[in-house]
Structures are given as structure tokens and as C-alpha cells.
Amino acid sequence: MNQSAYTARTGSLRAWGAPQVTVGGGNYLGELVTRYLLGERNYRGARDHLTPLDPEALTVVVVDGPAGLTPRAPLAMIDTAPAMHEALRQLVATGKSEGLTHAALAQSGVCEPQRWLELSQLNVAHARLLDDDATLGVGRYVGEWEVNA
């Protein structure tokens, strides 16, 4: 788990400038945003690896794409980031990827390459890219997948 996305203030977005927002649990930014969007329900905690998946549960994966898509991005402009952003858009849209490696992801400014590699190994039955954004220089994607067991 990316420790820069961790807060000791359980269930609070205070560390990210929203002290008035509490969501009842979670310590990682991805967990907190997921809880904010999905509301109250029975959650399992964040974990380091995606698999094994539970076919009876909704699994929400929160991971950023390249963080070097513009000169003002967190990692400044990285020449290979735009092509990687497009490759990750296609992965989210189709569930398929070709030639995705840890080294290529890391060199393109992806801070959690292992998470993307785990996603690329899933047996995806249906994939759909709902939205993507890179206006702040970091690739962000929203998609839904149905995976085969």
C-alpha cells in the first residue's frame, strides 16, 4: 500500500483538506473515497494484493495511472507517460493489455505498478471504461469489470 496515501485519522479526509468529511472507517485515501462514494455498508479493509477475489463481494480497486502527464504534474512531465496513460485506459476499457511490465509502468510514472500488473492478470468477462481524467497530470480511470472465477 502506498504510505503517502495513509492517514492515522481513521475515517477522516482531514489529511486531504476536508476535516468535515468522515466516513466511518478506513485509513488510505482510496478506502476513504470509496466509503464516501458508496456510503454505509459492510466493508472489508484495504489489502496489499487484489487476489484472491471473493465472488460474493464487490471489489473496488483504487490505483492511479502515470503521475507525469503534464509539466505541473506531481512527477513533472515524463515522456513515456502519455502512451502509458492510453495503455491503461485500454486496459480498463477492455480488460486486456499487451506488454505491460513493472519497469515500463514505473518508468512512465506509475507509483504502484504491481497493482496494475495484478489487474492485467485477471480473466475479464466484461469491461467498460466509464470515465477517465488527466487534467491534474495524473491518470485517473473509472471502470467496471466482471471477472471469471
PLM features: residue spans?
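Beta-strand elements within well-structured catalytic alpha/beta cores of enzymes
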Residues: 56-64
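Catalytic metal-binding/acid-base residues of hydrolase active sites
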Residues: 2, 63-67
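Flexible, D/E/H-enriched segments
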Residues: 1-49, 74-149
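Extended accessory regions or peripheral subdomains of proteins
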Residues: 66-75
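Short amphipathic alpha-helices and their capping/turn segments at secondary-structure boundaries
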Residues: 50-55
